[in-house]
Amino acid sequence: MRKFDTKVQLLKYKVLREVARIAFDEGEFSLANNFNDIAKTVTSDKATMRCCIYKERAIVAERIKLACGGNRANPNIIEVIDIACDECPASGYQVSHDCRGCIAHRCESACRKGAISFDENQKAHIDKTKCVNCGQCAKVCPYSAISNYTRPCEKACKIKAISMADSEENPAQIDNNKCINCGACSYACPFGAIMDKSFILDAIRILKDSNKGDGFNVYAVVAPSIASQFVYAKLGQVVTAIKKLGFYSVVEAALGADIVAYSESKELAEKGFLTSSCCPAFVDYVKKFYPKLTENISHNLSPMAAIAKYIKETDETAKVIFIGPCTAKKAEAKQERVAQYVDCVLTFEELQALIDSSKYTPLIHQGLNIVIAGAPNAGKSS
């Protein structure tokens, strides 16, 4: 049984599935004429998530654009859907109604910036122009009446790559110079206003051009976590479904890890101190925030790229599509040293949408249910 943590994930899945279905059945060039039809397909006749059905469909249209590859001029994988952003109110420490107006005024004593004042009822107030969000007032309040209200996206981004643009009335913006494409903000946003670009159309184009292996062979390199991703089906069923899509073979990325481990052990013995090159988000993090350690990053390819290189050395006309859980892998595949080996990257949710969209591929198992974890209808057919 396929479960989604939130309705945001379910909506994203529906958009990806419909985009893939049209690309499979009618060709990707027909997508431009089907934007409105897709928007109507994945939403109800009445507004269920936004102020009106028209805004819902406008937001879905933006999701469709990202499902089709997004803004190609923007090198970042993670993008903000401006119209979907709720422009959350200012973050920071705020005094709640739990303030009892005590006479101890510990919050005032703890604040070195003079940001705490009191009204005629002795209720505390914080001057946001003076507050530096140090949190000292919250620590000493005996009633825990001071809380730190943080925007979900900003809270999720530990490297502070996302913020509100200019003022509170503008949508969130991502600093590409800081962003490592980890996707934490995308998962955290309750409005689904942050999304990763999809290359599902690139994958479909490769599969179609291969003509079921008559033109060239398409290899699916899968991350080890595939074993726990499709918990409602046996791994063999998932592999069969992947091959039904037109893949020639399914290869474990773990084989690439063995190749990297062998080479990396020699580099480690030589350098003495070495950091991993396996995770592109981590590598990007080191380069952007700890540039002095760049030379200590392993010079080996990641397991994904290593096994893809091996495949292309043994099958010169091969195309390789990596399938895993990580959005940062999409950014890695665009790197010059990796792009020659990896032709496309899909996430597991995109693979699910691809499987469910293809008329050539039966559902992984009979009676597949799509539900949201914790929802009232969880466990029931939908």
What are these language model-derived features?
Residues 1-140, 144-156, 160, 352:
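Ferredoxin-type iron-sulfur electron-transfer modules and their immediate structural context
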Residues 127-128, 133, 143, 152-220, ...:
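Conserved Radical SAM active-site core
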Residues 1-69, 195-355, 362:
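Iron-sulfur-associated redox domains of electron-transfer enzymes in respiratory
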Residues 101, 105-110, 140, 188, ...:
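Transmembrane alpha-helical segments of multi-pass membrane transport proteins and ion-pumping complexes
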Residues 102, 180, 378:
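ATP-binding Walker
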Residues 90, 106, 112-113, 121, ...:
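Short coil/turn connectors at secondary-structure junctions
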Residues 86-94, 117-125, 164-166, 184-186, ...:
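Gly-rich Lys/Arg/Thr-decorated short loops/hinges at beta-loop-alpha junctions or inter-strand turns
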Residues 356-382:
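Conserved G1/Walker A P-loop phosphate-binding module
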